[in-house]
Amino acid sequence: TLLDYGCGKGRVDFFLSAQTRCQSIGVEYDDRIYAKAMENKKAAASGARTEFVLESAENFPVPVEVDRVYFFNPFSLEILRKAMARLLESCYENPREIQLFFYYPSDAYISYLMTVPELEFLDEIDCMDLFPGGDSRERVVIFTIQE
């Protein structure tokens, strides 16, 4: 199951649920954007495999079935720390490997993540060729929480 923090209107959730047939949970804090995601779910082919929750990341209890997490630089470093604490708490209670995907991460995110002892850096995918401008943040950085 994929957990998408700051899911917006649900595009990533719908796409990945359709392409990989995974279940997805989108967490959104803004009630107006959440309403759009719920509206989009009605028309999405993969809507039955997607769930949206109106909640702040730091208060969302991570379900035991979550094994993939996607972040599109959704919130401040302070909130990331709290969300990571929730993820780690879920892993302590129900040991499992979780892969974390950070798209367009800030330097502050990477600096913090490199200091979390439970995280292991897995890979970095350069995405600078997708858009003009050569933005070095156009990348996906992957970490894992080991069982």
Q: Model-derived features: where do they sit?
A:
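A short SAM/SAH-binding and catalytic strip from SAM-dependent methyltransferases
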Residues: 68-79
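Conserved SAM-binding motif I beta-strand of class I
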Residues: 23-28
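Glycine-rich SAM-binding Motif I of class I
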Residues: 10-14
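Gly/Ala-rich phosphate-binding loop of Rossmann-like dinucleotide-binding domains
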Residues: 17-18
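C-terminal substrate-binding/active-site "lid" region of AdoMet-derived donor-dependent transferases
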Residues: 78-139
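Conserved class I S-adenosyl-L-methionine
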Residues: 1-8
